[in-house]
Amino acid sequence: MNRGGSSASASANYLLCTNCRKVLRKDKRIRVSQPLTRGPSAFIPEKEVVQANTADERTNFLVEEYSTSGRLDNITQVMSLHTQYLESFLRSQFYMLRMDGPLPLPDRHYIAIMAAARHQCSYLINMHVDEFLKTGGIAEWLNGLEYVPQRLRNLNEINKLLAHRPWLITKEHIQKLVKTGENNWSLPELVHAVVLLAHYHALASFVFGSGINPERDPGIANGFRLISVSSFCVCDLANDNSIENTSLAGSNFGIVDSLGELEALMERMKRLQEDREDDETTREEMTTRFEKEKKESLFVVPGETLHAFPHSDFEDDVIVTADVSRYIEDPSFGYEDFARRGEEHLPTFRAQDYTWENHGFSLVNRLYSDIGHLLDEKFRMVYNLTYNTMATHEDVDTTTLRRALFNYVHCMFGIRYDDYDYGEVNQLLERSLKVYIKTVTCYPERTTKRMYDSYWRQFTHSEKVHVNLLLMEARMQAELLYALRAITRHLT
Protein backbone atom coordinates (compact mmCIF):
# COMPACT_ATOMS: atom_id res chain seq x y z
CA MET A 1 0.00 0.00 0.00
CA ASN A 2 1.19 3.49 -0.79
CA ARG A 3 1.52 5.06 2.63
CA GLY A 4 1.50 8.61 1.37
CA GLY A 5 -1.75 8.28 -0.53
CA SER A 6 -3.59 5.60 1.36
CA SER A 7 -5.57 8.00 3.51
CA ALA A 8 -6.98 9.80 0.53
CA SER A 9 -7.98 6.72 -1.38
CA ALA A 10 -9.21 4.73 1.58
CA SER A 11 -11.48 7.56 2.68
CA ALA A 12 -13.36 7.51 -0.59
CA ASN A 13 -16.50 6.01 0.87
CA TYR A 14 -19.75 7.90 0.42
CA LEU A 15 -23.24 7.46 1.75
CA LEU A 16 -25.19 8.52 -1.31
CA CYS A 17 -28.33 10.58 -1.62
CA THR A 18 -30.70 9.65 -4.45
CA ASN A 19 -29.52 12.29 -6.93
CA CYS A 20 -25.84 11.46 -6.49
CA ARG A 21 -26.62 7.77 -6.88
CA LYS A 22 -28.14 8.46 -10.29
CA VAL A 23 -25.09 10.47 -11.34
CA LEU A 24 -22.70 7.73 -10.26
CA ARG A 25 -24.63 5.15 -12.25
CA LYS A 26 -23.86 7.19 -15.36
CA ASP A 27 -20.25 7.92 -14.53
CA LYS A 28 -18.55 5.70 -11.96
CA ARG A 29 -15.26 7.55 -12.35
CA ILE A 30 -16.45 10.48 -10.25
CA ARG A 31 -13.92 11.64 -7.67
CA VAL A 32 -14.87 14.47 -5.32
CA SER A 33 -12.77 16.11 -2.65
CA GLN A 34 -13.26 18.83 -0.10
CA PRO A 35 -11.26 20.58 2.59
CA LEU A 36 -11.35 18.77 5.90
CA THR A 37 -13.84 20.12 8.41
CA ARG A 38 -11.88 21.73 11.19
CA GLY A 39 -11.17 19.88 14.39
CA PRO A 40 -11.16 16.23 15.40
CA SER A 41 -14.87 15.64 14.68
CA ALA A 42 -17.20 16.44 11.80
CA PHE A 43 -20.09 16.36 14.29
CA ILE A 44 -18.74 18.44 17.18
CA PRO A 45 -17.60 22.09 16.89
CA GLU A 46 -13.84 22.27 17.19
CA LYS A 47 -13.88 24.82 20.01
CA GLU A 48 -15.75 22.45 22.35
CA VAL A 49 -13.12 19.74 22.04
CA VAL A 50 -10.15 22.12 22.04
CA GLN A 51 -11.39 23.85 25.20
CA ALA A 52 -11.64 20.49 26.96
CA ASN A 53 -8.13 19.49 25.90
CA THR A 54 -6.63 22.83 26.89
CA ALA A 55 -8.22 22.75 30.32
CA ASP A 56 -7.16 19.23 31.16
CA GLU A 57 -3.43 18.59 31.58
CA ARG A 58 -4.28 14.99 32.46
CA THR A 59 -5.05 14.27 28.80
CA ASN A 60 -1.56 15.30 27.70
CA PHE A 61 -0.02 13.14 30.41
CA LEU A 62 -2.08 10.13 29.31
CA VAL A 63 -1.04 10.61 25.69
CA GLU A 64 2.64 10.75 26.65
CA GLU A 65 2.23 7.64 28.82
CA TYR A 66 -0.01 5.40 26.73
CA SER A 67 -0.37 6.62 23.15
CA THR A 68 1.11 4.20 20.61
CA SER A 69 1.39 6.96 18.00
CA GLY A 70 3.02 9.45 20.37
CA ARG A 71 0.58 12.23 19.52
CA LEU A 72 -2.87 13.50 20.43
CA ASP A 73 -4.95 11.89 17.70
CA ASN A 74 -8.56 12.79 16.92
CA ILE A 75 -10.08 9.82 18.77
CA THR A 76 -8.20 10.75 21.93
CA GLN A 77 -9.22 14.40 21.62
CA VAL A 78 -12.91 13.52 21.45
CA MET A 79 -12.65 10.93 24.23
CA SER A 80 -10.89 13.52 26.39
CA LEU A 81 -14.32 15.01 27.03
CA HIS A 82 -14.40 12.13 29.57
CA THR A 83 -10.88 11.95 30.98
CA GLN A 84 -11.66 9.29 33.58
CA TYR A 85 -12.77 6.90 30.88
CA LEU A 86 -9.95 7.93 28.54
CA GLU A 87 -7.36 6.68 31.01
CA SER A 88 -8.97 3.21 31.17
CA PHE A 89 -9.29 3.11 27.39
CA LEU A 90 -5.69 4.12 26.65
CA ARG A 91 -4.25 1.77 29.27
CA SER A 92 -6.10 -1.26 27.93
CA GLN A 93 -5.36 -0.40 24.30
CA PHE A 94 -1.68 0.18 25.04
CA TYR A 95 -1.50 -3.17 26.83
CA MET A 96 -3.04 -5.15 23.96
CA LEU A 97 -0.87 -3.40 21.34
CA ARG A 98 2.50 -2.88 23.03
CA MET A 99 2.96 -4.84 26.25
CA ASP A 100 4.06 -8.46 26.63
CA GLY A 101 1.55 -10.80 25.07
CA PRO A 102 1.19 -13.94 22.96
CA LEU A 103 1.20 -12.19 19.56
CA PRO A 104 4.09 -10.41 17.77
CA LEU A 105 3.67 -6.63 17.58
CA PRO A 106 3.17 -6.40 13.78
CA ASP A 107 0.50 -9.13 13.87
CA ARG A 108 -1.45 -7.15 16.45
CA HIS A 109 -1.68 -4.16 14.13
CA TYR A 110 -2.54 -6.30 11.12
CA ILE A 111 -5.40 -7.87 13.08
CA ALA A 112 -6.57 -4.33 13.94
CA ILE A 113 -6.56 -3.54 10.20
CA MET A 114 -8.59 -6.67 9.44
CA ALA A 115 -11.13 -5.75 12.12
CA ALA A 116 -11.50 -2.12 10.99
CA ALA A 117 -11.91 -3.22 7.37
CA ARG A 118 -15.12 -5.11 8.20
CA HIS A 119 -16.71 -1.67 8.69
CA GLN A 120 -14.72 0.13 5.98
CA CYS A 121 -13.14 2.29 8.70
CA SER A 122 -10.33 3.92 6.74
CA TYR A 123 -9.38 6.07 9.76
CA LEU A 124 -8.34 3.03 11.81
CA ILE A 125 -6.89 1.21 8.81
CA ASN A 126 -4.58 4.13 8.00
CA MET A 127 -3.51 4.45 11.63
CA HIS A 128 -2.55 0.79 11.93
CA VAL A 129 -0.91 0.56 8.53
CA ASP A 130 1.57 3.11 9.89
CA GLU A 131 1.92 1.26 13.20
CA PHE A 132 2.31 -2.08 11.41
CA LEU A 133 5.28 -0.78 9.44
CA LYS A 134 6.82 1.02 12.43
CA THR A 135 6.82 -2.22 14.44
CA GLY A 136 8.62 -4.16 11.71
CA GLY A 137 5.71 -5.49 9.69
CA ILE A 138 6.35 -6.89 6.20
CA ALA A 139 5.23 -4.26 3.70
CA GLU A 140 4.06 -6.88 1.21
CA TRP A 141 1.28 -7.92 3.60
CA LEU A 142 -0.36 -4.54 2.94
CA ASN A 143 -1.10 -5.63 -0.63
CA GLY A 144 -3.94 -7.76 0.72
CA LEU A 145 -4.88 -10.96 2.51
CA GLU A 146 -3.48 -13.20 -0.21
CA TYR A 147 -0.01 -11.94 0.78
CA VAL A 148 -0.22 -12.82 4.49
CA PRO A 149 0.53 -16.20 6.11
CA GLN A 150 -2.34 -18.70 6.03
CA ARG A 151 -2.43 -18.61 9.82
CA LEU A 152 -3.58 -14.98 9.80
CA ARG A 153 -5.98 -15.59 6.93
CA ASN A 154 -7.62 -18.28 9.02
CA LEU A 155 -8.93 -15.50 11.29
CA ASN A 156 -11.25 -14.27 8.53
CA GLU A 157 -14.22 -16.38 9.55
CA ILE A 158 -14.17 -15.42 13.22
CA ASN A 159 -13.48 -11.79 12.28
CA LYS A 160 -16.54 -11.78 10.04
CA LEU A 161 -18.81 -13.44 12.59
CA LEU A 162 -17.64 -11.34 15.54
CA ALA A 163 -18.16 -8.12 13.58
CA HIS A 164 -21.65 -8.87 12.30
CA ARG A 165 -23.29 -11.96 13.87
CA PRO A 166 -21.33 -13.06 16.94
CA TRP A 167 -24.12 -15.42 18.10
CA LEU A 168 -23.13 -17.78 15.27
CA ILE A 169 -19.69 -18.48 16.79
CA THR A 170 -19.42 -22.05 18.06
CA LYS A 171 -16.78 -24.25 19.63
CA GLU A 172 -16.26 -25.76 16.15
CA HIS A 173 -14.91 -22.40 14.94
CA ILE A 174 -12.47 -22.43 17.85
CA GLN A 175 -11.42 -26.03 17.21
CA LYS A 176 -10.78 -25.26 13.56
CA LEU A 177 -8.32 -22.52 14.54
CA VAL A 178 -6.45 -24.40 17.26
CA LYS A 179 -6.23 -27.73 15.39
CA THR A 180 -4.93 -26.79 11.95
CA GLY A 181 -1.46 -28.33 11.99
CA GLU A 182 1.39 -25.95 11.31
CA ASN A 183 -1.02 -22.99 11.03
CA ASN A 184 -2.72 -23.58 14.37
CA TRP A 185 -3.32 -20.93 17.02
CA SER A 186 -2.57 -21.51 20.67
CA LEU A 187 -5.43 -20.57 22.99
CA PRO A 188 -3.52 -17.58 24.48
CA GLU A 189 -2.81 -16.31 20.94
CA LEU A 190 -6.43 -16.77 19.95
CA VAL A 191 -7.73 -14.92 23.01
CA HIS A 192 -5.34 -12.05 22.26
CA ALA A 193 -6.61 -11.96 18.66
CA VAL A 194 -10.26 -12.07 19.75
CA VAL A 195 -9.73 -9.17 22.16
CA LEU A 196 -8.12 -7.13 19.37
CA LEU A 197 -10.89 -7.94 16.89
CA ALA A 198 -13.66 -7.04 19.34
CA HIS A 199 -11.84 -3.87 20.39
CA TYR A 200 -11.45 -2.55 16.85
CA HIS A 201 -14.93 -3.54 15.68
CA ALA A 202 -16.30 -1.54 18.62
CA LEU A 203 -13.86 1.33 18.11
CA ALA A 204 -15.05 1.63 14.50
CA SER A 205 -18.52 2.24 15.95
CA PHE A 206 -17.11 5.09 18.03
CA VAL A 207 -15.20 6.56 15.08
CA PHE A 208 -18.29 6.72 12.87
CA GLY A 209 -20.70 7.57 15.69
CA SER A 210 -18.58 10.55 16.74
CA GLY A 211 -17.79 11.71 13.20
CA ILE A 212 -14.04 11.39 13.76
CA ASN A 213 -12.19 13.31 11.05
CA PRO A 214 -9.16 11.86 9.23
CA GLU A 215 -5.87 12.96 10.75
CA ARG A 216 -4.46 15.96 8.94
CA ASP A 217 -1.74 14.87 6.55
CA PRO A 218 0.71 17.58 5.46
CA GLY A 219 1.55 15.44 2.42
CA ILE A 220 -1.85 16.09 0.87
CA ALA A 221 -1.78 19.19 -1.28
CA ASN A 222 -3.98 22.16 -0.36
CA GLY A 223 -5.44 20.31 2.62
CA PHE A 224 -7.81 18.34 0.37
CA ARG A 225 -8.80 14.79 1.07
CA LEU A 226 -11.68 12.56 0.08
CA ILE A 227 -14.30 12.83 2.79
CA SER A 228 -15.36 9.79 4.79
CA VAL A 229 -18.83 8.28 4.72
CA SER A 230 -19.79 9.45 8.17
CA SER A 231 -20.14 13.15 7.49
CA PHE A 232 -21.84 14.27 4.30
CA CYS A 233 -23.07 13.19 0.89
CA VAL A 234 -21.02 14.34 -2.10
CA CYS A 235 -23.70 16.87 -3.05
CA ASP A 236 -23.10 18.68 0.26
CA LEU A 237 -19.61 19.52 -0.97
CA ALA A 238 -20.86 21.57 -3.89
CA ASN A 239 -23.19 23.46 -1.56
CA ASP A 240 -20.41 24.13 0.97
CA ASN A 241 -22.29 22.46 3.81
CA SER A 242 -19.87 22.69 6.70
CA ILE A 243 -20.37 21.41 10.22
CA GLU A 244 -21.68 24.81 11.26
CA ASN A 245 -24.20 24.92 8.42
CA THR A 246 -25.54 21.43 9.08
CA SER A 247 -25.86 22.20 12.76
CA LEU A 248 -28.03 25.18 11.93
CA ALA A 249 -30.12 23.08 9.60
CA GLY A 250 -30.66 20.54 12.35
CA SER A 251 -32.05 23.25 14.63
CA ASN A 252 -35.11 23.52 12.41
CA PHE A 253 -36.61 20.58 14.29
CA GLY A 254 -37.62 23.11 16.89
CA ILE A 255 -36.09 24.18 20.19
CA VAL A 256 -39.46 24.18 21.92
CA ASP A 257 -40.15 20.57 20.93
CA SER A 258 -36.74 19.40 22.11
CA LEU A 259 -37.21 21.11 25.47
CA GLY A 260 -40.50 19.29 25.84
CA GLU A 261 -38.80 16.00 24.94
CA LEU A 262 -36.17 16.54 27.64
CA GLU A 263 -38.74 17.27 30.33
CA ALA A 264 -40.80 14.24 29.28
CA LEU A 265 -37.73 11.99 29.41
CA MET A 266 -36.82 13.18 32.89
CA GLU A 267 -40.38 12.59 34.05
CA ARG A 268 -40.32 9.03 32.69
CA MET A 269 -37.00 8.36 34.44
CA LYS A 270 -38.39 9.65 37.72
CA ARG A 271 -41.52 7.54 37.37
CA LEU A 272 -39.52 4.39 36.62
CA GLN A 273 -37.36 4.89 39.70
CA GLU A 274 -40.45 5.34 41.86
CA ASP A 275 -42.26 2.37 40.33
CA ARG A 276 -39.27 0.07 40.87
CA GLU A 277 -39.70 0.37 44.63
CA ASP A 278 -43.18 -1.16 44.37
CA ASP A 279 -42.45 -3.42 41.43
CA GLU A 280 -43.91 -6.91 41.56
CA THR A 281 -43.17 -7.93 37.97
CA THR A 282 -42.75 -11.69 37.61
CA ARG A 283 -39.78 -13.38 35.95
CA GLU A 284 -42.11 -14.62 33.21
CA GLU A 285 -43.32 -11.10 32.49
CA MET A 286 -39.73 -9.85 32.24
CA THR A 287 -38.93 -12.61 29.75
CA THR A 288 -41.99 -11.66 27.70
CA ARG A 289 -40.92 -8.01 27.63
CA PHE A 290 -37.44 -9.00 26.44
CA GLU A 291 -38.88 -11.08 23.59
CA LYS A 292 -41.16 -8.19 22.66
CA GLU A 293 -38.27 -5.70 22.61
CA LYS A 294 -36.08 -8.11 20.65
CA LYS A 295 -38.75 -8.52 17.98
CA GLU A 296 -39.54 -4.80 17.89
CA SER A 297 -35.87 -4.11 17.17
CA LEU A 298 -36.49 -5.73 13.78
CA PHE A 299 -38.53 -2.72 12.79
CA VAL A 300 -35.87 -0.21 13.81
CA VAL A 301 -34.24 0.25 10.43
CA PRO A 302 -30.59 1.41 10.51
CA GLY A 303 -30.06 4.57 8.54
CA GLU A 304 -33.85 4.82 8.43
CA THR A 305 -34.81 7.96 6.54
CA LEU A 306 -38.52 7.80 5.82
CA HIS A 307 -39.78 7.79 9.40
CA ALA A 308 -37.00 9.18 11.55
CA PHE A 309 -35.46 11.66 9.10
CA PRO A 310 -38.19 13.01 6.80
CA HIS A 311 -35.93 15.75 5.44
CA SER A 312 -33.20 13.33 4.36
CA ASP A 313 -32.93 11.49 1.06
CA PHE A 314 -30.01 9.24 1.93
CA GLU A 315 -29.97 5.67 0.69
CA ASP A 316 -27.90 2.76 1.93
CA ASP A 317 -25.50 2.48 -0.99
CA VAL A 318 -21.85 2.64 -0.01
CA ILE A 319 -18.88 2.57 -2.36
CA VAL A 320 -16.16 0.31 -0.95
CA THR A 321 -12.66 1.18 -2.12
CA ALA A 322 -10.03 -1.38 -3.06
CA ASP A 323 -7.81 -0.17 -0.20
CA VAL A 324 -10.40 -1.48 2.26
CA SER A 325 -11.63 -4.58 0.44
CA ARG A 326 -8.13 -6.07 0.17
CA TYR A 327 -8.24 -6.78 3.91
CA ILE A 328 -11.53 -8.69 4.03
CA GLU A 329 -13.21 -11.71 2.50
CA ASP A 330 -16.95 -12.04 1.88
CA PRO A 331 -17.57 -8.24 1.94
CA SER A 332 -21.33 -8.68 1.46
CA PHE A 333 -21.65 -10.48 4.81
CA GLY A 334 -23.19 -8.08 7.35
CA TYR A 335 -25.38 -7.77 10.40
CA GLU A 336 -28.63 -9.70 10.32
CA ASP A 337 -31.24 -9.16 13.01
CA PHE A 338 -30.83 -11.69 15.77
CA ALA A 339 -34.62 -11.98 16.02
CA ARG A 340 -35.58 -12.55 12.42
CA ARG A 341 -39.18 -12.18 11.32
CA GLY A 342 -41.20 -15.38 11.36
CA GLU A 343 -39.03 -17.36 13.77
CA GLU A 344 -40.92 -18.77 16.73
CA HIS A 345 -38.17 -20.24 18.89
CA LEU A 346 -35.40 -17.66 19.03
CA PRO A 347 -32.18 -18.76 20.74
CA THR A 348 -31.24 -16.35 23.51
CA PHE A 349 -27.96 -15.86 25.35
CA ARG A 350 -28.99 -15.74 29.01
CA ALA A 351 -26.44 -13.46 30.63
CA GLN A 352 -26.79 -15.30 33.93
CA ASP A 353 -25.54 -18.52 32.29
CA TYR A 354 -22.31 -16.94 31.06
CA THR A 355 -21.43 -13.57 32.54
CA TRP A 356 -18.40 -11.39 32.01
CA GLU A 357 -17.86 -11.10 35.77
CA ASN A 358 -18.07 -14.81 36.61
CA HIS A 359 -16.88 -16.52 33.44
CA GLY A 360 -15.39 -14.31 30.71
CA PHE A 361 -13.14 -12.31 33.02
CA SER A 362 -11.44 -15.33 34.59
CA LEU A 363 -10.98 -17.11 31.24
CA VAL A 364 -9.43 -14.16 29.44
CA ASN A 365 -7.21 -13.37 32.42
CA ARG A 366 -5.99 -16.96 32.61
CA LEU A 367 -5.06 -17.15 28.93
CA TYR A 368 -3.91 -13.54 28.41
CA SER A 369 -2.54 -12.29 31.70
CA ASP A 370 -3.87 -9.00 33.14
CA ILE A 371 -5.95 -7.93 30.13
CA GLY A 372 -9.04 -9.11 32.02
CA HIS A 373 -8.42 -6.60 34.81
CA LEU A 374 -7.94 -3.76 32.32
CA LEU A 375 -11.06 -4.63 30.33
CA ASP A 376 -13.11 -5.05 33.50
CA GLU A 377 -12.00 -1.63 34.73
CA LYS A 378 -12.98 -0.10 31.38
CA PHE A 379 -16.42 -1.76 31.32
CA ARG A 380 -17.14 -0.67 34.89
CA MET A 381 -15.87 2.84 34.25
CA VAL A 382 -18.14 3.55 31.28
CA TYR A 383 -21.17 1.87 32.86
CA ASN A 384 -20.87 3.86 36.10
CA LEU A 385 -19.59 7.14 34.62
CA THR A 386 -21.94 9.99 35.48
CA TYR A 387 -21.85 13.69 36.23
CA ASN A 388 -25.45 13.64 37.52
CA THR A 389 -26.50 16.05 34.80
CA MET A 390 -28.85 15.99 31.83
CA ALA A 391 -28.49 18.93 29.44
CA THR A 392 -28.98 21.97 31.72
CA HIS A 393 -30.35 19.98 34.68
CA GLU A 394 -28.19 19.00 37.64
CA ASP A 395 -28.50 16.41 40.42
CA VAL A 396 -30.07 13.88 38.07
CA ASP A 397 -29.71 10.14 38.61
CA THR A 398 -29.02 8.78 35.10
CA THR A 399 -28.61 5.14 36.14
CA THR A 400 -31.79 3.93 34.42
CA LEU A 401 -30.84 5.69 31.19
CA ARG A 402 -27.32 4.28 31.09
CA ARG A 403 -28.61 0.80 31.83
CA ALA A 404 -31.23 1.06 29.05
CA LEU A 405 -28.58 2.07 26.49
CA PHE A 406 -26.22 -0.75 27.45
CA ASN A 407 -28.91 -3.42 27.63
CA TYR A 408 -30.54 -2.37 24.35
CA VAL A 409 -27.27 -3.04 22.52
CA HIS A 410 -27.06 -6.47 24.14
CA CYS A 411 -30.71 -7.11 23.27
CA MET A 412 -29.95 -6.58 19.56
CA PHE A 413 -27.23 -9.21 19.93
CA GLY A 414 -29.64 -11.63 21.62
CA ILE A 415 -28.32 -11.26 25.19
CA ARG A 416 -30.95 -11.19 27.96
CA TYR A 417 -30.63 -10.17 31.61
CA ASP A 418 -33.23 -12.01 33.68
CA ASP A 419 -33.36 -9.28 36.31
CA TYR A 420 -33.89 -6.38 33.89
CA ASP A 421 -37.28 -5.01 32.89
CA TYR A 422 -37.02 -4.39 29.13
CA GLY A 423 -40.14 -2.27 29.31
CA GLU A 424 -37.75 0.49 30.43
CA VAL A 425 -36.09 0.50 27.01
CA ASN A 426 -39.27 1.54 25.24
CA GLN A 427 -40.04 4.16 27.84
CA LEU A 428 -36.60 5.78 27.80
CA LEU A 429 -35.25 5.41 24.26
CA GLU A 430 -37.11 7.37 21.58
CA ARG A 431 -37.30 5.99 18.06
CA SER A 432 -34.67 8.31 16.56
CA LEU A 433 -32.26 7.26 19.32
CA LYS A 434 -32.97 3.58 18.64
CA VAL A 435 -32.23 4.15 14.95
CA TYR A 436 -28.97 5.85 15.90
CA ILE A 437 -28.00 3.06 18.34
CA LYS A 438 -28.71 0.30 15.84
CA THR A 439 -26.82 2.10 13.08
CA VAL A 440 -23.75 2.90 15.19
CA THR A 441 -23.64 -0.56 16.72
CA CYS A 442 -24.52 -2.78 13.76
CA TYR A 443 -23.85 -0.68 10.63
CA PRO A 444 -21.50 2.10 11.85
CA GLU A 445 -20.32 3.02 8.34
CA ARG A 446 -23.87 4.25 7.58
CA THR A 447 -23.91 6.81 10.40
CA THR A 448 -24.59 10.40 9.34
CA LYS A 449 -24.50 13.72 11.13
CA ARG A 450 -28.24 14.05 10.70
CA MET A 451 -28.71 10.90 12.79
CA TYR A 452 -26.34 12.25 15.44
CA ASP A 453 -28.21 15.57 15.54
CA SER A 454 -31.69 14.02 15.49
CA TYR A 455 -31.83 12.61 19.02
CA TRP A 456 -31.65 14.36 22.41
CA ARG A 457 -31.33 17.76 20.77
CA GLN A 458 -30.97 19.60 24.09
CA PHE A 459 -28.10 17.41 25.28
CA THR A 460 -24.48 18.52 25.11
CA HIS A 461 -21.94 17.01 22.73
CA SER A 462 -20.12 15.64 25.77
CA GLU A 463 -23.25 13.72 26.74
CA LYS A 464 -23.61 12.33 23.22
CA VAL A 465 -19.97 11.21 23.27
CA HIS A 466 -20.79 9.46 26.55
CA VAL A 467 -23.60 7.64 24.71
CA ASN A 468 -21.10 6.56 22.05
CA LEU A 469 -18.72 5.24 24.71
CA LEU A 470 -21.52 3.18 26.23
CA LEU A 471 -22.49 1.78 22.83
CA MET A 472 -18.86 0.94 22.03
CA GLU A 473 -18.23 -0.92 25.28
CA ALA A 474 -21.59 -2.71 25.21
CA ARG A 475 -20.79 -3.94 21.73
CA MET A 476 -17.28 -5.07 22.67
CA GLN A 477 -18.56 -6.94 25.71
CA ALA A 478 -21.26 -8.67 23.64
CA GLU A 479 -18.69 -9.88 21.11
CA LEU A 480 -16.38 -11.11 23.85
CA LEU A 481 -19.15 -12.98 25.64
CA TYR A 482 -20.00 -15.01 22.54
CA ALA A 483 -16.36 -15.71 21.64
CA LEU A 484 -15.28 -16.59 25.18
CA ARG A 485 -18.31 -18.83 25.67
CA ALA A 486 -17.30 -20.75 22.53
CA ILE A 487 -13.73 -21.09 23.86
CA THR A 488 -15.06 -22.31 27.21
CA ARG A 489 -17.18 -24.94 25.46
CA HIS A 490 -14.12 -26.02 23.49
CA LEU A 491 -12.24 -26.52 26.75
CA THR A 492 -14.98 -28.55 28.45
UniProtKB/Swiss-Prot annotation:
It is found in: Cytoplasm. L-leucine binds at residues 386-389, 398, 463. The keyword Metal-binding does not apply. Gene3D superfamilies: AhpD-like. May function as an intracellular leucine sensor that negatively regulates the TORC1 signaling pathway. May also regulate the insulin-receptor signaling pathway through activation of TORC2. This metabolic regulator may also play a role in protection against oxidative and genotoxic stresses. May prevent the accumulation of reactive oxygen species (ROS) through the alkylhydroperoxide reductase activity born by the N-terminal domain of the protein. Belongs to the sestrin family. Detected in liver and skeletal muscles. Transmembrane segments: none annotated. Its main location: cytoplasm. The N-terminal domain may have an alkylhydroperoxide reductase activity. The C-terminal domain mediates interaction with GATOR2 through which it regulates TORC1 signaling. It is an enzyme of class 1 (oxidoreductase). The active site is at 121 (cysteine sulfenic acid (-soh) intermediate). It comes from the Eukaryota. Its EC number is 1.11.1.-. Disruption phenotype: Liver-specific Sesn3 knockout mice display insulin resistance and glucose intolerance. Sesn2 and Sesn3 double knockout mice display insulin resistance and glucose intolerance. Triple knockout mice lacking Sesn1, Sesn2 and Sesn3 do not display an embryonic lethal phenotype since they are born at an expected Mendelian ratio. Moreover, they are not distinguishable from their wild-type littermate. However, their survival at 10 days is dramatically affected. It catalyses: a hydroperoxide + L-cysteinyl-[protein] = S-hydroxy-L-cysteinyl-[protein] + an alcohol. Interacts with the GATOR2 complex which is composed of MIOS, SEC13, SEH1L, WDR24 and WDR59; the interaction is not regulated by leucine. Interacts with RRAGA, RRAGB, RRAGC and RRAGD; may function as a guanine nucleotide dissociation inhibitor for RRAGs and regulate them. Interacts with the TORC2 complex; through RICTOR. This is Sestrin-3. GO terms for cellular component: cytoplasm; GATOR2 complex; nucleus. One of its GO terms (molecular function) is oxidoreductase activity.
